[in-house]
Amino acid sequence: MRLILLGPPGAGKGTQAAFLTQHYGIPQISTGDMLRAAVKAGTPLGLEAKKVMDAGGLVSDDLIIGLVRDRLTQPDCANGYLFDGFPRTIPQADALKSAGIALDYVVEIEVPESDIIERMSERRVHPASGRSYHVRFNPPKAEGVDDVTGEPLVQRDDDREETVRHRLNVYQNQTRPLVDYYSSWAQSDAAAAPKYRKISGVGSVDEIKSRLSQALQS
């Protein structure tokens, strides 16, 4: 099973990715993790990436694709892989395609923007332990305080409404075009084209998991 999960921040991709990697016995491939590992290991590509990052530059798509190719040769990718946060742009998707990196499915998790803002802006965390709550869906026993310690809960900067709206704008401008890119490719009937599936990300974790499983069997 070789796939990409697409969807806006807050759509629940992380939760569903954890389920898929366990279910299919495949690794979750994050370009951030790959970069850190390559830099730490001092591989030729890692050293090249470190030079760029130390100078405050952005690592090129060619370099990222090189890292992806290296990563996919490792034994844990024998049954497939799940791309996490990659590709983010059309040039990256083109580079992935040109490199002949195979995909079986591209799944879009669709959630209305208003739901995402509500989901993320109502999250609260206990900083010391990392325990998280949701004002509406998973509230603490006593309002505003941690269940275990009774210490106050906080809202992370990332979860503030204005930050969430900014991240959604970035997604719409940069990553949302991938939805059209992959759905068009899937409809083209080209030999290497992945299947494109769209599911609703509204509902309980188990409901979404069930939709995802069905989509990957169709």
From Swiss-Prot:
Report what the protein is called: Adenylate kinase
Q: What organism does the UniProt record list as the source? A: Bordetella pertussis (strain Tohama I / ATCC BAA-589 / NCTC 13251)
Q: Which domain of life is it from?
A: Bacteria
* One MF term in the entry's GO annotations: adenylate kinase activity
Residue spans crossing the bilayer? none
One Gene Ontology CC term in the entry: cytoplasm
Q: Which reaction does it catalyse?
A: AMP + ATP = 2 ADP
Q: Where does ATP bind?
A: 10-15, 123, 132-133, 203
The ranges of region (LID) come to 122-159
Disulfide bond annotation, renumbered to this chain: none
Binding of AMP: at which residues?
31, 36, 57-59, 85-88, 92, 156, 167
Q: Which Pfam families match?
A: ADK, ADK_lid
